[in-house]
Amino acid sequence: KVVVGEEATGTWCPWCTRGTHFMHVMEESYKGYWAGIAVHNGDPMVVSEYDQGIGALIGGYPSGVVDRGAEVDPSGFPGAFLENVQMTPAAIITNGAFYDATTAELAVSLKVDFSKAVSGDWRLICVLTEDSVHGTGADWSQANAYAGGGSGPMGGFENLPSPIPFDQISYDHVARAISPSFEGKANSFPTSVADGDSHTLLYSFSVPADWNTDKMHIIGMLINDQGVTENGSTSSINEATAHGLDNGSWITGVTLMDMPDKEMMIYPNPNDGNMVIKTNIDAGLVKVFDVEGRLVNTTTIPANGMIELNDNLETGIYIVNVYNKMNEVVATEKLMVK
């Protein structure tokens, strides 16, 4: 069981240093069992879709929800965690990923293994967070109601000024993107799921140059038919890429981070002859040619647009073409096999 805590915060909010402190406490005390997400409001780190979603669940700042339950002050995170972590979830989530540093495209797989039968509208959400986020200017300085110690101790914030200058603070667990939306895609799974079933959904993000993937985490949230987070998952991007990208179905409606405007993606690329080819074309063929123009593989595009190619191609450079149902070439990519 991984408990997910979503904290509403903002640099303008003087009491939000309490939230920062308790998010740190939770990460230090329950690492691997707690997935913390700092959802910013009214500052340079805001993700509008996420901010609006969390805003509908709270009455003020700082505040938050644990596993999408009742509103709770950040000081109540430990108690809510200890209550929820004892629950046996209906499924566990495994994070996988592939990151292409050249194109800055991140593909994420969330593999859900069910250990009991479920039914109804279950959903799966993918969140990206980043640690050590910082910037320059007054909007990056943190208001601090605990300055001077008059409001008691708060993890060292009582020893810092208000505002805390931008060059003296950085921000952790910062929500960077949420997909496909705050609520998730309706009916992400079949209406009835059997005990032992496994389902994998795939998500695609374009990573801006000022994000540090070495400091980023992938958090999965399985939302049950009551709108509560049944279980979560957490891993660094590096851990997820070490696991690799699991085969699955691409989710649609990525919020803020639209799927790349490309008819085809190949990953990994370069590779050892084993790869996944993803295309937005729902009918047609994918053909692979060597540099001499010889056809070495032809595959019919399946309904989900996902092709696993395991032909163990020889080392070299290949050209991959996507053909639509009228046999027209609609996309071409260079493939390198090492």
Where are these regions (language model features)?
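Low-complexity, Pro/Thr/Ser/Gly/Ala-rich linker/spacer regions in secreted
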Residues: 1, 246-261
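Local sequence-structure signature of Cys/Sec-based thiol-disulfide redox active-site neighborhoods
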Residues: 1-32
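Extracytoplasmic/periplasmic beta-strand context in beta-sandwich domains
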Residues: 3-6, 37, 62, 273, ...
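Acidic/polar N-terminal loop/beta-strand segments that form early-domain functional surfaces
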Residues: 8, 39-42, 291
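Short, conserved sequence motifs used for protein processing/export or organelle targeting and
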Residues: 32-251
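C-terminal outer-membrane/trafficking sorting elements
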Residues: 257-338
